[in-house]
A protein has these predicted regions:
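Short glycine-/polar-rich loops that comprise or flank the Walker A/P-loop
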Residues: 80-82, 118-121
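Extended alpha-helical interface modules used as scaffolds for assembling large macromolecular complexes
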Residues: 1-105, 109-113, 126, 132-141
Length: 141
């Protein structure tokens, strides 16, 4: 439970390093054979967030702009901002950073934040096996 709380706190604080650290510790506990595609990682993160963040409605595959977000955190109160998460699975460690950049670019190019506040948080996550990488941006670039 400690790691789950650390992860959800890191998401709320928009702290990419702490998100990566908690996620890696969580992923180390399972077999990489279970992490077969992007959906595997989406399910892990959704489960972590859904059970721990009471200020948000956590949804997958929400139609936004010109596509569907991998994960969307809709705030339940006006003092919170929406968060859009896009996931990428890569085949090598060197592809982690470019994949997080591509995830943020996809959110912008497909206009997933259309009609949302300019401070909407964009989170690009890439995974190489049990190694996560996180990049955080916002809708107003």
């Amino acid at each position: 439970a400690r790691l789950f709380k650390q992860f959800s706190r890191a998401v709320g604080d928009r702290n990419a390093e702490k998100m990566e650290k908690a996620l890696q510790e969580i992923l180390v506990g399972g077999s990489y054979l279970n992490l077969v595609d992007e959906n595997s990682y989406i399910l892990v993160v959704m489960t972590l967030l859904r059970g721990l963040i009471s200020d948000y409605d956590v949804r997958t595959e929400v139609e936004q702009g010109n596509g569907r977000t991998d994960l969307f955190l809709r705030p339940l109160s006006s003092n919170k901002v929406p968060m859009i998460l896009e996931f990428k699975k890569v085949d090598s460690e060197k592809d982690l950073v470019p994949a997080t950049e591509e995830a943020i670019r996809q959110i912008r190019d497909k206009r997933y934040a259309l009609g949302m506040p300019s401070d909407t948080v964009l989170i690009g996550m890439a995974f190489w096996g049990k190694v996560p990488k996180v990049l955080i941006g916002n809708a107003n670039r």
